[in-house]
């Protein structure tokens, strides 16, 4: 599924990275298109299911939404945040359910999955594994030249963008301008 191109006597790879920040009420998603060392944002945002009362209906909506995104953009990989230990076990279980739904949606469309811990994402983007969400969003805005008016209000979207960008950096092809 990885596409390759001959450019300037070099073989370069093209990737479409789907980043997902799983959640039970809001799911962040982002799509990055990379060719060699070039990276551009195809789409990013938050899928909102908070108005549905039934937790399983929310998971079903997230599953179908991700399948639609996969059908539209044909990502070559799903990069998803691995779960951290939460103080509230019930919260953690619900988030793990959302993570499982995202992974199942990708695998049902033959999209491979990679996981990154929140600390790894923060370290890759800011150089500090304990950076806060606003610091990560600020760095992504700089690296990806996102105009202020396009920055989302909900940080779930920039979290997903950070996960996708972290995977891009792991490919060993960063171009920071």
Predicted regions and their residues:
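Phosphate- and other anionic-substrate recognition elements at nucleic-acid/protein interfaces
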Residues: 1-177
